[in-house]
Amino acid sequence: MRVSVFAVGRMKAGPERELVERYFDRFSKAGPPLGLEFAGVSEIPESRGQTAELRKAEEAQRIHEALDNGAALILLDERGKALGSEAFADRIGRMRDDGKRQLIVAIGGPDGHDPALRTRADLVLALGELTWPHQIARILIAEQLYRAATILAGHPYHRS
């Protein structure tokens, strides 16, 4: 299953970007033996629409256009369900085992995700009840994708 991360907005060079790249590099090495191929990060420009609803709709359209038929979609959203790392790994493993060829993990912009995109999502995931800056959300999902691969592989990185 090809795994991509779509993020609204750009991440500037710096230590946060380096940490994200480090975890995605680890994931790209750990994933293939498990049937998980990291396809990279796609940065979606923030909409310049006049209202939050218009901005969310435009950003959702860009994400929707990238989805293959039958692709799995995980949205990071504060209204989502908080999962532990093992449950998150299990969900990814089940998506892979169910024959999904593509998984997109989407990080929304400052206004969040459009309700229609939340309805389309296979999983709406919250990173806890706290609000996180975009850069930290990227770090967290990069680390959790790597952690999920190690859990699925039975590697000792994750200690429950």
Curated annotation (Swiss-Prot):
Gene Ontology terms for molecular function: rRNA (pseudouridine-N3-)-methyltransferase activity
Positions bound to S-adenosyl-L-methionine: 76, 108, 127-132
Broadest EC class assigned to this enzyme: transferase
Keywords: Cytoplasm, Methyltransferase, rRNA processing, S-adenosyl-L-methionine, Transferase
Signal in keyword set: no
Gene3D superfamilies: 3.40.1280.10
EC code(s) of this entry: 2.1.1.177
Alphabetical list of Pfam families matching this protein: SPOUT_MTase (PF02590)
An example Gene Ontology CC term for this record: cytoplasm
UniProt keyword Methyltransferase present: yes
Catalytic function, reaction form: pseudouridine(1915) in 23S rRNA + S-adenosyl-L-methionine = N(3)-methylpseudouridine(1915) in 23S rRNA + S-adenosyl-L-homocysteine + H(+)
Protein location: Cytoplasm
Main location: cytoplasm
Recorded family membership: Belongs to the RNA methyltransferase RlmH family.
Quaternary organization: Homodimer.
Annotated function: Specifically methylates the pseudouridine at position 1915 (m3Psi1915) in 23S rRNA.
Protein name per its UniProtKB record: Ribosomal RNA large subunit methyltransferase H
Name of the gene this protein is made from: rlmH
